[in-house]
Amino acid sequence: MQYTAAQSQSVAIIGASGYVGVELTRLVQQHPALSLLGCYVSEHSSDAGSLLSDLHPQYAHLVKLSLQGLSSQKKELIKSSADTVFLCTDHGVSVELAPEFLAAGLKVIDLSGGFRLNATEDYPSFYGFEHQQDSWLQQAVYGLAEWYPQEIAAAQLVAVPGCYPTAALMALLPVKQAGLLSCNKIIINAVSGVTGAGRKAALTSHGAELSLQAYGLFEHRHTPEIAQQLQHEVLFTPHLAQFPRGILATVYAELNDDVSDADLDKAYQCYADQPLVRFEKQARPAIKNVVQQPFVDIGWHRQGNQLIAFSAIDNLLKGAASQAIQCVNLQLGLALEEGLL
């Protein structure tokens, strides 16, 4: 399909060497309405000058690009030549870089947590830095594509949701929006593949050390993100497992009295026309069915007033890169699934 100039975008990817960055690069390269200006890493990164395919040889047939150090000259090139910048950088780095590109009139799709929370005072405790960009924080739109399409379409700055929040919110928002949840705390347990820990070597994600373990008890940075979007108290426990990629979230919620299966069916019908949501009432989603796919698979079971809902996603795709593409599609007036199926 041919696209008009208004529907075609030149994009730059900063932080392209990581797991999310290379997935995003692959998706941009395959997207009919996007042209890739360049892939960038920190100016002093050891990856600068490397071929992306050297770091990720499984994509050698798709991605034959050099990783460029983000010098001041490269920043000026991006400002003058790109329409949209994807930030696959550390949270604090995104907060530093985004305002510079936004001030130049570019759109920014931030895949870090730098603009996900509403309040700057939450950042020292959950992200470890003082957030100095309150104005942009208030303007950022949360990029959960199926739920905020109009807001995303009009936004200059989009904060792509975290991987765990994406899985949890996709399972819970239909029930919350329908007013079916009691006021009691929601419990969320989620298991992620090891790519969720990033590319940098760490003992906790070393193959010989890893099995299945909970982490971030009571203090994981995705807890306030989930609670903020649900406007509901949650108890979230993430787990890291010894498989490469994917997330399975299991959520436990108490329903209001007299909520029926029919009420739940009606609530989840909000996904009936969503091309990247696969929903089945009695399904028990499995990670193997979503790995390397842009879908979210959802299922639920009810007993009395207790709801157990499941959600499975690929943490690198629906949990990051493909959701970012969905956001760009909305901004270009394209179908959500454009370039993804």
From Swiss-Prot:
| InterPro entries, sorted | AGPR_AS (IPR023013), AGPR_type-1 (IPR000706), NAD(P)-bd_dom_sf (IPR036291), NAGSA_dehydrogenase (IPR050085), Semialdehyde_DH_NAD-bd (IPR000534)
Q: Does Nucleotide-binding appear among the keywords?
A: no
Q: Where is the signal peptide?
A: none
Q: Where in the cell is it found?
A: Cytoplasm
Q: In which pathway does it act?
A: Amino-acid biosynthesis; L-arginine biosynthesis; N(2)-acetyl-L-ornithine from L-glutamate: step 3/4
Which residues are responsible for catalysis? 163
- Cellular component, GO, one term: cytoplasm
Q: What is its EC number?
A: 1.2.1.38
Catalytic activity annotation = N-acetyl-L-glutamate 5-semialdehyde + phosphate + NADP(+) = N-acetyl-L-glutamyl 5-phosphate + NADPH + H(+)
Q: Please state what class of enzyme this protein is.
A: oxidoreductase
Q: Give the molecular function GO annotations.
A: N-acetyl-gamma-glutamyl-phosphate reductase activity; NAD binding; NADP+ binding
Q: Name one GO biological process term.
A: L-arginine biosynthetic process
The record's section on PANTHER family has: N-ACETYL-GAMMA-GLUTAMYL-PHOSPHATE REDUCTASE, CHLOROPLASTIC-RELATED, N-ACETYL-GAMMA-GLUTAMYL-PHOSPHATE REDUCTASE, CHLOROPLASTIC-RELATED-RELATED
Q: Family, per the entry?
A: Belongs to the NAGSA dehydrogenase family. Type 1 subfamily.
**Name of the protein this chain belongs to:** N-acetyl-gamma-glutamyl-phosphate reductase
Q: Which organism is it from?
A: Idiomarina loihiensis (strain ATCC BAA-735 / DSM 15497 / L2-TR)
